A protein has these predicted regions:
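N-terminal capping/small domains of soluble enzymes
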Residues: 1-80
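A mid-to-C-terminal "edge-of-domain" accessory segment
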Residues: 2-3, 7-9, 253-419, 459-464
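Active-site mouth loops of central-metabolism enzymes
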Residues: 9-25, 74-80, 109-113, 142-151, ...
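Non-catalytic terminal/interface segments that mediate subunit docking, oligomerization
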Residues: 15, 20, 29, 369-478, ...
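Alpha/beta enzyme core
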Residues: 23-39, 86-98, 102-107, 120-135, ...
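Alpha-helix-loop-beta-strand connector modules within alpha/beta enzyme cores
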Residues: 53-75, 120-131, 186-199
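Mixed-charge, glycine-accented linear interaction segment located at domain edges/termini
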Residues: 477-479, 483-506
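Conserved small/polar residues in nucleotide/adenosyl-binding loops
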Residues: 510-517
């Protein structure tokens, strides 16, 4: 079974609140749809909208003509005494999707015409369009209401037009009111009454049933369906292209010709152009949908792929990921280590897992990019004795005033308090500790020689921060690091690790020698 997909991202999708594609964005999306995804048909505009829309449509049609795609370009037209026909013809397009009324209410109250008058207008428009070489598809706007509440109107309209030069009769669920059982019933009625006609189904997602209704429509033999990238469209949107393609391929066993492994790329580009973010859990294209969080799932994947289904991420140009968090367990850690090419013994994996759990209490998810930093943090500091601990600290930052740090630390079991101002919050923190060491402990405090902040790639504001600080202690260089989602906390961790190194006399020589090998602590 072949199901023809018509993408209306550039027409109906642009009717999403707050979305307006620039001309070059529309041209870019059209190229992606036709040449990367291999969409059979795309609806690019509504006739007579604006001068800018006309220039875009004309430029796109010129490109499509050169690339052999011109018959795949469609433009929405209206019953306006031939004005839409001329607009579309002068753009260079070959197909007009003519909007007529698919319910008696729309015909009576919006057009204020009888069905006979409406039929005559449609026939005259079809005749004019054919005279200038345009092909016609016919939208029955509000068909879902019409077939439920005024079926005789719908059948009267269809009986009068079934022998006209119409390529496709397109059945919109304009207000998104149908459920799958109703879609089956009404589409089947149309197919049985008019078996020789070609029908498209056009879903809207008001009840979150657009994909299910599209699926139901194809079960009745409907030959074409309409979608948009990321489900863009009026109100709750249209049927999302990626979900519809997957359902047609896997559940209908239909052929669409769509290149599945390009859908994620196209989705991301349209997301960027539209400014409408894709939900993380949106099927197939959401950021998290191919991420296993539970450790038992990762363990099952290690044992004959027990938690796989037909929606393999590679089908859609993506990769499976294993989340690092409090529920992930060692199986998830192992999966991520494999992907990074890192091998650790069981005891090290146990320590890394414990650290991931600790971090996940502060951060919703630890990313794979964070993992090398965590490993370095855990394995390089596992033997440092905890002679110095931070009991509490307060950092104040106020407009026009110097930052203030108030701290309480424990050194060898005894608590000390200190406070200081500084040029920054960390500077104030270090000066407060230096006061404690000099004034209360009578000890030398190392001087800071270098301070480096590393943030894993990805650009997330909640990414783990690795802070590496170099210290000069009596002519010896120490290098310590901290790791946290908060940059200040990471710097404080690095500072406390340094203090523990110099406090632990038994291991100080060993750690000081690490500098000579290029290692950092």
């Amino acid at each position: 079974m072949v199901v023809e997909i018509m993408d209306t991202t550039l027409r109906d999708g642009e009717q999403t609140s707050g979305v307006s594609f620039a001309r070059q964005e529309k041209l870019s999306i059209a190229r992606l749809l036709l040449e990367d995804l291999k969409i059979p048909r795309i609806e690019i505009a509504s006739a007579r909208v604006s001068t800018g829309e006309y220039e875009m449509a004309k430029q796109l049609c010129e490109w499509a003509e050169k690339r052999g795609h011109i018959d795949k370009i469609e433009i929405l037209g209206f019953l306006d005494k031939g004005a839409s026909i001329e607009w579309i013809r002068s753009c260079g397009a070959k197909v007009m999707n003519l909007l007529c009324k698919g319910s008696e209410k729309h015909c009576t109250f919006q057009l204020q015409k009888t069905v006979q008058e409406h039929v005559e207008d449609i026939k005259q428009t079809i005749k004019k369009a054919k005279e200038v070489g345009l092909k016609i598809n016919l939208y029955l706007e509000d068909w879902s209401n019409g077939i439920q509440h005024s079926p005789q109107y719908v059948f009267h309209l269809m009986d009068a037009l079934k022998n006209e030069a119409v390529e496709r009769f397109m059945l919109p669920d304009t207000l998104g009111i149908l459920n799958p059982l109703q879609t089956l019933k009404f589409c089947r009625a149309m197919r049985r009454r008019y078996p020789d006609l070609r029908f498209d189904f056009h879903a809207h997602n008001d009840y979150d049933l657009a994909t299910a209704n599209t699926f139901a429509a194809t079960l009745t033999g409907i030959q074409g369906v309409h979608c948009t990238v990321n489900g863009l469209g009026e109100r709750a949107g249209n049927a999302p292209l990626t979900s519809v393609v997957a359902v047609l391929h896997d559940h209908v066993k239909a052929t669409t010709g769509i290149t599945e492994n390009m859908v994620n790329k196209v989705s991301r580009i349209v997301e960027s152009y539209s400014g409408i973010r894709v939900a993380a859990n949106k099927p197939i294209i959401g950021e998290s949908v191919f991420t296993q969080c539970a450790g038992v799932h990762a363990d099952g994947d290690n044992k004959n792929n027990l938690y796989y289904n037909d929606l393999l991420p590679e089908r859609f140009g993506r990769k499976r990921e294993y989340a690092l968090g409090k529920t992930s367990g060692r199986a998830n850690i192992r999966k991520n280590l494999e992907s990074l090419g890192i091998e650790l013994d069981d005891e090290s994996i146990k320590r890394v897992t414990q650290r991931v759990v600790e971090l996940s209490d502060k951060k919703e998810m630890v990313t794979p990019e964070d993992l090398p930093y965590i490993i370095s943090d855990v394995l390089k500091h596992e033997t440092i004795a905890q002679h110095v601990k931070v009991i509490n600290y307060t950092l104040n930052l106020s407009q026009g005033l110097k930052p203030v740090a108030i701290i309480a630390i424990e050194v060898n079991g005894k608590t000390y308090e200190g406070a200081s101002t500084g040029d920054g919050q960390y500077d104030a923190f270090v000066k407060a500790i230096r006061k404690i060491y000099k004034e209360q402990l009578g000890r030398t405090f190392p001087s800071l020689t270098n301070y480096t902040v590393n943030i894993p790639p990805g650009g997330h504001t909640d990414a783990l921060v690795q802070t590496v600080i170099s210290w000069d202690y009596n002519g010896n260089i120490l290098k310590t690091q901290g790791l946290d989602a908060d940059q200040m906390e990471a710097a404080i961790q690095a500072t406390i690790k340094m203090l523990n190194l110099i406090e632990d006399k038994a291991v100080s020589y060993t750690h000081l020698r690490a500098h000579e090998t290029g290692a950092y602590l």
